[in-house]
UniProtKB/Swiss-Prot annotation:
Heme c 2 binds at residues 166, 169-170, 308. It holds the Pfam family Cytochrom_C552. Heme c 4 binds at residues 290, 293-294, 400. It comes from Aliarcobacter butzleri (strain RM4018). Residues 1-23 form the signal peptide. SUPFAM superfamilies: Multiheme cytochromes. GO terms for cellular component: outer membrane-bounded periplasmic space. GO terms for molecular function: calcium ion binding; heme binding; nitrite reductase (cytochrome, ammonia-forming) activity. Ca(2+) binds at residues 216-217, 269, 271. The lineage of its organism: Bacteria, Pseudomonadati, Campylobacterota, Epsilonproteobacteria, Campylobacterales. Pathway: Nitrogen metabolism; nitrate reduction (assimilation). The keyword Lipoprotein does not apply. Its cofactor is Ca(2+); heme c. Heme c 3 binds at residues 100, 210, 213-214. This is Cytochrome c-552.
Length: 496
């Protein structure tokens, strides 16, 4: 009797397990059918969560960029940057980039975007939204590039509300890779050496979708027929994409982002030239794409998908580096750390030299130096800081192109040194032989040195975030552009 009870129990358990297995198989089959079916997604659907039904793994891995939430205050880490950017918004607030999930939060909370009180106020143009959201190519399509690039940043506060996501890189109707920002193709044509969107292969596109944003750019003042002026995002590639090529481009058109508050130098602010830096390194020369390393393929059961947790490839070395490199992870990491240490050393020396040049130039103006005496000096400072910033703003430059990065920082130090030698002669000519530029010790001291009213700026920003910013979100929700549930549990973090 006991034997039959035992067999009966075993049979029940077996039937149960078979039921679970069959249910799992059916679920996987249904999921595969969903994945292979034609997505029922509108062409300009910019709410990223709407893609989860058809692409759950891709969406869930993208959402993991939410975990990259730490604020790393770069001005606190490198207070010299405050003086390097004196007179420019970056001296107020500059943090290391966080995950794509926070793109809208970070630009909205930054002191750089100021504290607008309506759609027509604030310090920055609408172009400052360009790389933050899939809502941008939607608006470009609806209104045209000229209209989009016209007006203040606050103009689109209630329209650009979803962080970097699906439509930035994919056509929702086919899920093919796409570039929705036309200035990239314009620049590729102007450069004349790289594949354009018309000739790009699938492998090329796995980099070009990233190059929509991870590039050097400037805002080109473009007068329009209606009397308005567009501040159009433009990539300075007409001469090529090296640091020297772009320096020549900017010098030829006599462009400057701002005039330095202390040295009176017409400055160029490098943005984030990862694509240009990548091109000069081993990975770029061998067409190893951005996605190959930052979005590796992942296998889950019978389903292979691209990991959309865009971040540091070193966190997934078995799926990234070790696919090609036949050395141990330990050896590879040691090599990378050595490259970073060398870059960090030259980076610090470059900052110190350029800061001293700015302050010594300020002293020269103070004691009566003439524009003619200062002309070549200011050119040296301009070129030194452009080259330093090019290497520093591309956060991964030491990895993507270590030799090029060290060369760039080396020439930055050289040019800053040349400026200081000339400044010593100018200062001596005007009776100053013992001036020593103050040492920059911390962020607070540096911001006080250049006269930034930080308390006032922070208070104004808090009024904006507690007022107009909330109004934008409410308006966007009413328009159907924004789902507040997508931001539940998100903590506001800043460096101030």
């Amino acid at each position: 009797m006991k034997k039959y009870k035992f067999l009966f129990a075993i049979s029940i358990i077996a039937i149960g397990l078979m039921t679970v297995l069959l249910a799992s198989i059916n679920e996987k089959k249904e999921e595969k059918e969903n994945l292979l079916s034609v997505p029922k997604i509108e062409k300009w659907e910019t709410k990223n969560e709407e893609f989860r039904k058809f692409y759950p793994r891709e969406f869930d891995s993208w959402k993991q960029t939410k975990n990259s939430d730490q604020i790393d205050d770069m001005l606190k880490l490198h207070p010299e940057m405050v003086v390097l950017w004196a007179g420019y918004a970056f001296s107020k607030d500059y943090n290391a980039p966080r995950g794509h999930f926070y793109a809208i939060d970070d630009v909205s909370n930054s002191l750089r975007t100021g504290a607008p009180t309506d759609k027509e106020s604030g310090p920055l143009p609408s172009a400052c939204w360009t790389c933050k959201s899939p809502d941008v190519p939607r608006i470009m399509h609806e209104q045209g590039n000229n209209e989009y690039f016209t007006g203040k940043w606050a103009k689109y506060g209630a329209d650009i509300v979803n962080p970097i996501g699906c439509v930035d890189c994919h056509n929702p109707e086919t899920m093919e890779l796409q570039v929705g920002r036309s200035y990239l193709n314009d620049a590729l044509k102007a450069e004349g050496k790289s594949p354009t969107l018309a000739t790009a292969t699938q492998q090329d596109m796995r980099t070009l979708v990233c190059a929509q944003c991870h590039v050097e750019y400037y805002f080109k003042k473009t007068p329009l027929e209606n009397g308005k002026t567009a501040m159009a995002v433009t990539l300075p590639w007409a001469n090529g994409t090296t640091v020297e090529d772009m320096e020549k481009y900017y010098d030829t058109i006599e462009f400057s982002d701002w005039v330095h508050q202390v040295s009176k130098t017409p400055m160029i602010k490098a943005q984030h030239p990862e694509y240009e830096t990548w091109k000069t390194g081993a990975h770029g020369r061998n067409n190893v794409s951005c996605a190959d390393c930052h979005m590796p393929y992942t296998q889950e059961g019978g389903i292979k998908y691209t990991d959309h947790k865009i971040g540091n490839p070193l966190e997934n070395m078995d799926k990234t580096c070790m696919n090609c490199h036949r050395v141990s992870e330990k050896s590879l990491l040691a090599n990378i750390q050595d490259k970073k240490a060398r870059k960090d050393d030259l980076n610090q020396k470059a900052m110190e030299q350029i800061v001293a040049a700015h302050l010594e130039a300020g002293k020269a103006w103070e004691v009566g130096a003439t524009p003619e005496e200062m002309k070549d000096i200011l050119t040296d400072i301009r070129h030194a800081q452009w080259r330093w910033d090019f290497a520093a703003a591309s956060h991964s430059a030491f990895f993507h192109a270590p030799e090029e990065t060290l060369k760039t920082l080396g020439t930055a130090i050289e040019k800053a040194g040349n400026a200081r030698i000339k400044l010593a002669k100018v200062l001596a000519k005007h009776g100053v032989t013992d001036y020593k530029a103050p040492t920059i010790t911390d962020k607070k001291q540096a911001q006080e040195l250049i006269g930034l009213p930080m308390g006032k700026l922070i208070e104004e920003k808090k009024q904006f975030t507690n007022g107009l910013l909330k109004d934008w979100k409410n308006e966007a929700e009413q328009k159907g552009l924004y789902n507040p549930k997508s931001r539940e549990g998100v903590e506001t973090k800043t460096s101030y």
